[in-house]
């Protein structure tokens, strides 16, 4: 890990969403230098599952060697922001560094995102970052250090990053646009940069929302804290950059990233917005049996100041550096995938006259080509899947799940099916359930069969647009766990 140098001794660091997760990790790293930390977050009462409040964070910061000032701040409330800034200046004499970490997330498409969720994401992510920066800038300009760091991604305009969660992407990119604008506006006075993880980051909320074992696919929050510390050490001329945690730490001389991993050697989950070919990333994750970081964390609306890559689901170091898992150039450069039309046209056959005079069976694709072509389920595959599911049900499964699922399947052998895990012993069948479904899942029949047989991860299907979910996401997650138990039979 990156050692502390004492560079931040006496500096005042204002961090939003610092009661837990990434925000608190950055605070503790700075505290080891003897920095003053303003904990600007909402949580004042203990949460039954998400540990940490502004007061418990303050105790940890003091124990690490820093001086803490806990402030109740909802970044949607300009008055609370200004009040916290005033208290910080009154107690510490100024502000040297601002970290815009608080964020809200909902991985839902346009029609499934209620206006209140859109407003929340825009107000917390973009507006909150803008207002907090605006309030701190007069004091940052007076500082010899003068840094603003936003936890936001590079501006990758590939439409595939917008398609499934347009509102979230716009809101998150708003934070990144603040970096673009303010870096130029205050060039020479304040350094303004963005930091984003290459992989999923593990926090307490990840365990709650991602299920057992998800932490093995993540890195610790320490990698973000070390990367942020590296940025703070740099001069004001280092500005307008969109930094990936792993890259800047390599510049610091870090070669072995094992210390940041939760599980050494386990495949890691790449984060959003980094790959120019998202479909290739999805294939890579699925091929390595990885469940995306976005997972359930990002399927639910929560503040990243609480989730901040605690699950979501938001954000991701490793014990063994596996660049091949993160970059997988071979997935992006397979000409077979990009040139399928040649396989369909087969020009070499059209140029042979004897084919027209003496018809013969069509040449079969080679095994590799066959694996690249879409496979249709055989007749009755859906019905057979439900039969096996039915045989796997028990009162114990029903008690553990307590949900009714409806499947809207398109294509061959499609239609409406249901899985009732509320009734005694459980029920399955064709048509709509007798009771209203808690979760409705829409997808193609072949993808449905792959999903229940373990060949397609539900989260992967959701991220790639193959699966659409309406209803209770937490219950959808329970179904994924049930699928895992049944995969061997399917």
From Swiss-Prot:
**Database matches in CDD domains:** HSDL2_SDR_c
Transmembrane segment boundaries: none
Q: Where are stretches of biased composition, namely Low complexity?
A: 302-367
N6-acetyllysine found at:
116
Q: Which GO terms describe its cellular component?
A: mitochondrion; peroxisome
- Which Gene3D superfamilies did the record assign? NAD(P)-binding Rossmann-like Domain, SCP2 sterol-binding domain
Q: Which UniProt keywords apply?
A: Acetylation, Hydroxylation, Mitochondrion, NADP, Oxidoreductase, Peroxisome
Where do the segments described as Disordered lie? 282-370
InterPro entries recorded:
HSDL2, NAD(P)-bd_dom_sf, SCP2_sterol-bd_dom, SCP2_sterol-bd_dom_sf, SDR_fam
Question: What positions does the domain SCP2 occupy?
Answer: 380-487
The GO biological-process annotations, alphabetized, read as: cholesterol homeostasis
Task: Please name the NCBIfam families in this protein's record.
Answer: PRK08278.1
The record's family statement is: Belongs to the short-chain dehydrogenases/reductases (SDR) family.
Identify this protein by name.
Answer: Hydroxysteroid dehydrogenase-like protein 2
Q: Which organism is it from?
A: Mus musculus (Mouse)
Upper classification of the organism: Eukaryota, Metazoa, Chordata, Craniata, Vertebrata
Gene expressing this chain: Hsdl2
């Amino acid at each position: 890990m990156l050692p502390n140098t004492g560079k931040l001794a006496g500096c005042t660091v204002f961090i939003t969403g610092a009661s837990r997760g990434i925000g608190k990790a950055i605070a503790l790293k700075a505290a080891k230098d003897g920095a003053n930390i303003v904990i600007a977050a909402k949580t004042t009462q203990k949460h039954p599952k998400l540990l940490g409040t502004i007061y418990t964070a303050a105790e940890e910061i003091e124990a690490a060697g820093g001086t803490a000032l806990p402030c109740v701040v909802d970044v949607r409330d300009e008055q609370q922001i200004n009040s916290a800034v005033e208290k910080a200046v009154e107690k510490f004499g100024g502000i040297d560094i601002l970290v815009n970490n608080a964020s809200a997330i909902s991985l839902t498409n346009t029609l499934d995102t209620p206006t209140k969720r859109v407003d929340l994401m825009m107000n917390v992510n973009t507006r909150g970052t803008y207002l907090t920066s605006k309030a701190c800038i007069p004091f940052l300009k007076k500082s010899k250090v003068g840094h603003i760091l936003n936890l936001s991604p590079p501006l990758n305009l590939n439409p595939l990053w917008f398609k499934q969660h347009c509102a979230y992407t716009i809101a998150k990119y708003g934070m990144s646009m603040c970096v673009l604008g303010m870096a130029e506006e205050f060039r020479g006075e304040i350094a303004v940069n963005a930091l984003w993880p290459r992989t999923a980051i593990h926090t307490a909320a990840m365990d709650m929302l991602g299920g057992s074992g998800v932490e093995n696919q993540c890195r610790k929050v320490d990698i973000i804290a070390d990367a942020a510390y590296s940025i703070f050490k740099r001069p004001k001329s280092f500005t307008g950059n969109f930094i990936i945690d792993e890259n800047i730490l390599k510049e610091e001389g870090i070669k072995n990233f094992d210390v940041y991993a939760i599980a050494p050697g386990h495949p890691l989950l790449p984060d959003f917005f980094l790959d120019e070919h998202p479909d290739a990333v999805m294939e890579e994750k699925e091929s390595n049996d990885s469940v995306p970081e976005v997972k359930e964390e990002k399927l639910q609306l929560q503040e990243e100041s609480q989730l901040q890559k605690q699950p979501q689901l938001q954000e991701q170091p490793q014990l063994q550096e596996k660049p091949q898992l993160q970059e997988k150039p071979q997935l992006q450069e397979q000409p077979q995938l990009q040139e399928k039309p040649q396989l369909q046209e087969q020009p070499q056959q059209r140029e042979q006259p004897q084919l027209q005079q003496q018809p013969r069976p069509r040449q079969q694709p080679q095994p590799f080509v066959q694996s690249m072509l879409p496979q249709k389920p055989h007749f009755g595959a859906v019905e057979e899947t439900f039969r096996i599911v039915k045989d796997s049900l028990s009162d114990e499964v029903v008690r553990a799940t307590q949900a009714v699922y409806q499947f809207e399947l398109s294509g061959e052998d499609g239609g409406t099916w249901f899985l009732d895990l509320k009734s005694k012993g459980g029920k399955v069948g064709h048509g709509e359930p007798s009771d209203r479904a808690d979760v409705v899942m829409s997808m193609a029949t072949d993808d449905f069969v792959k999903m229940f047989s373990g060949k397609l991860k539900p989260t992967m299907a959701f991220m790639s647009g193959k699966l659409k979910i309406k209803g209770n996401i937490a219950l959808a997650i329970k179904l994924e766990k049930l699928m895992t138990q049944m995969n061997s039979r399917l």
